[in-house]
Amino acid sequence: MKLIREEIESVKYLVETTKSGKKSLYIEGVFLQGNIKNRNGRMYPMETLRKEVSRYNESNVQSGRALGELGHPDGPTVNLDRVSHKIVSLKESGDNFIGKAKILSTPMGKIASALVEDGVKLGVSSRGIGSLKQTREGVNIVGDDFMLATAADIVADPSAPDAFVEGIMEGKEWVWDGGILREKYACLLYTSPSPRD
């Protein structure tokens, strides 16, 4: 399986105030898009996204475990020391999934909050693993084995996604090994010619 990352540019910032006066910062917008070729040359069939978002909502969002990071790590696991937000909802709307995430009071969440307060326009980027199948037209169709690591990481440069999010990490694959997700490196075996040759 390959690591797959996608960026979305348009997110809104919301500030909600509780009755006690405590303010919470949220980001909201399109987190995932289906049935359309994206700038990375990939297309997520809606049925694949629908199935995976349903699983992700049940296992992560509803249990308060749907976390995202500030920036994009190189692997499919969420690093707790880099967590900046918690995804609180992810709902289908046409060929999109609209998400909402609460910015947390973690060190990375505080950085994200400061960036927003200082007027920085941030984007979101999904991260997951799955297989890709290329069509004759050169579109990479994401397979039905796709699994979200997070529906949204917060990223700094959504205006240049092709430079920042190449999407597939060359030379690495992720495999299940006894219930643990492990990195598998591509390996080439070279042999020297035998003396008889």
Model-identified regions with their sequence ranges:
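Residue microenvironments linked to proteolytic maturation
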Residues: L3-E7, K12-G29, R65-E69, N79, ...
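N-terminal "first-domain core" detector
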Residues: F31-Y56
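Short, surface-exposed beta-strand/loop "edge" segments at domain boundaries and coil↔beta transitions
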Residues: Q33-N40, D74-V78, P107-K110
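Intrinsically disordered/low-complexity terminal segments and short unstructured peptides
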Residues: E16-T17, E47, Y190
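Short, well-structured hydrophobic secondary-structure segments
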Residues: S59-G64
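Selective for proline/serine-rich intrinsically disordered segments
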Residues: M43, G71, A156-S159, P193
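Short coil/turn linker and secondary-structure boundary residues
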Residues: M43-Y44, T48, V78, V88, ...
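Conserved small/polar residues in nucleotide/adenosyl-binding loops
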Residues: Y190-D197
